[in-house]
Amino acid sequence: MRTNPTTSRPGISTIEEKSVGRIDQIIGPVLDITFPPGKLPYIYNALIVKSRDTADKQINVTCEVQQLLGNNRVRAVAMSATEGLMRGMEVIDTGTPLSVPVGGATLGRIFNVLGEPIDNLGPVDTSATFPIHRSAPAFIELDTKLSIFETGIKVVDLLAPYRRGGKIGLFGGAGVGKTVLIMELINNIAKAHGGVSVFGGVGERTREGNDLYMEMKESGVINEKNIEESKVALVYGQMNEPPGARMRVGLTALTMAEYFRDVNKQDVLLFIDNIFRFVQAGSEVSALLGRMPSAVGYQPTLSTEMGSLQERITSTKKGSITSIQAVYVPADDLTDPAPATTFAHLDATTVLSRGLASKGIYPAVDPLDSTSTMLQPRIVGNEHYETAQRVKETLQRYKELQDIIAILGLDELSEEDRLTVARARKIERFLSQPFFVAEVFTGSPGKYVGLAETIRGFQLILSGELDGLPEQAFYLVGNIDEASTKAINLEEESKLKK
């Protein structure tokens, strides 16, 4: 197989290198193209079909070389619809892989897999481009120090902390606050870490992608008046796109994130929604290319494809890419090859609970189901670890007692169990938090809570010092001092009512 240089050879203009082939066969999004002898393109090269269809309408289709078939023929996968293409049409080899715009000019904009803006705001003002196929950072470039990525969200930082440069799986159904949590993380990384975010919508519903964009504009994550001050770049490959586009859109988003890490030396947050759709698109392409399917009909190269994406998401000595990936689990089967392969790469899981959302506790992160490999005494320290374990024990005991309370009532519990329930209910409410991006809906100012403040707050609840305060004082507050202030205000209000 011919390897692909990511840039043109020195001293030779790209125009001189371009070779022209002709379409031989079209099967859906797969094109077979014949090139002159000695002019075959490299694997992963971008090919462009520019022509006019029978209605004299302009055709502009970009493809990516996937296989060299022999007899001067290559097989390529189209990145857009192939309607209007005919056998015999000219195909130009660009001589390089797909390259996309990178840098500060991408912030606040929406792109497709080819790096073309699709938000009707005109061309992107940047000359810098990166190829989407790049090697993972070398071992000597990696930052091996284990460090916590502070999000300012109490429940995450205390019970399932994120690793700087790690990968987090976000599990949640519709309507439990996934989008708001994503937007808050984008907002917090910009304010606390001076970082930026890249959102990759892989196989998303177009409606959801549009809703996310509108909500980001409403909450200020995307600044309409001054687009350069936006904190996020969006890359969409929706459900209606051909499988080639859905398979590569994750790499386009990752490439934009790599520029911020390697060139701007920033901490970057990369969202991929949904990582399952990346695997699904790869499976479709694999079948179209005639490969023999593997377990459950997935592509035989599943682990390799997943690894080539995930290994590029890491911390280097320059900066970090921390990735949050929404994971769809088909038929709730965790042993399915797609989620099973994803789990092997994750450092933490954040599980959103419909039960907590129905109680009005936001963020609705399940404190018992969410896990993290970072929650170890040698990484987070003994104080953090012990506080987190005691919080989990208290909540677990409350969960066990709920059936008894439902049948017999709270009065039938022992004094010790009643105290546990009271503290658990305070903890549950203190895990809620007002978000900056939700200010426009709730009217409550958002709060960023540092890790030390979070630990101090839960220690005070567990020690019993705050047993006299009412439960509602802990609901939707930032640090523990706000809870104490809220308790005084509630007491004064109740006196006035009397």
From Swiss-Prot:
Give the disulfide map. Answer: none
Question: What's the EC number here?
Answer: 7.1.2.2
Q: Give the membrane topology.
A: Peripheral membrane protein
Give GO BP annotations, semicolon-separated: proton motive force-driven mitochondrial ATP synthesis
Database matches in SMART domains: AAA (SM00382)
Q: How does it assemble?
A: F-type ATPases have 2 components, CF(1) - the catalytic core - and CF(0) - the membrane proton channel. CF(1) has five subunits: alpha(3), beta(3), gamma(1), delta(1), epsilon(1). CF(0) has four main subunits: a(1), b(1), b'(1) and c(9-12).
Annotated function:
Produces ATP from ADP in the presence of a proton gradient across the membrane. The catalytic sites are hosted primarily by the beta subunits.
The protein's name in its UniProt record:
ATP synthase subunit beta, chloroplastic
Q: Which gene encodes it?
A: atpB
